Amino acid sequence: MLTLFIVMAFYLIRQKRFSQALWLRRVEAPTLWTGAALAPALYLAVSMVLLVLPESWMESYNEASSGITSGGVVGVLAVVAAAPIVEEVIFRGLIMTRLNQAVPGWLAVALSAVIFGACHGDPVWFGYAFPLGLVFGFIDLRAGSIWPSILAHMAFNGIGQVLDVLPDSDEAVLGFFLALLASAVILPILDRRGIKALFRRNPKAAPGQSLPTTPGVYEFDPWET
């Protein structure tokens, strides 16, 4: 996967349209932070799903996860910063945008989410990576940039890292999830302008052309006041 990213990035750089092709476009604060504002709610939703899964599934998931969370500071930086950037550039910046040139935007989001989930390997990881891919893809589709999903992905992974370093006590875990619940309510309210912008209708979007090739070519403006 990393090799694919390097090859594609090198090609796009040579074409002098790297940021444009990967949708690393500037977005204003309300839209930029929308994904991060939704991250606590997404983490709570995933946690609820994990609670009802068979114990045998969770054993393999926990074994795979332990290798990721035991890398010290470097491991944390890889999970919270490097992985979200690389994965969002690949799955949303490269794959979703190319799919959207051939199929409607909603299908490009769905297909890229399936690929995103499948590349995580473990069935449990697919079970939460797929819906996360749908949310990340939708946000980027409406914003015309992958920066919102990069921050959302970082926030989601960061929440998991905080949980991993908590003391092993019921009180600590309860306090963590209560704080997460409060964040899931408060942050979307604070970012209501950015969230509202995502659902503003784009009258010029058409199947196969939902995402602008140039910022601002559609009447829909996700950071419009």
Task: Describe each region flagged by the PLM.
Residues 86-111, 138-145:
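Membrane-interface helix/loop boundary segments of multi-pass membrane proteins
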Residues 1-15, 30, 34, 176-178:
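Alpha-helical transmembrane segments in multi-pass membrane proteins
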Residues 113, 124-180:
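Functionally important transmembrane alpha-helices
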Residues 9-18, 139-141, 186-195:
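Structural signal for the C-terminal ends of transmembrane alpha-helices
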Residues 19-89, 97, 101, 197-207, ...:
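Juxtamembrane helix-loop-helix connectors linking adjacent transmembrane helices
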Residues 105-120, 154:
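Small-polar-interrupted transmembrane alpha-helices in polytopic inner-membrane proteins
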Residues 154-225:
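C-terminal membrane module of polytopic membrane proteins
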Residues 18, 28-31, 72-73, 103-110, ...:
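Membrane-helix interface segments
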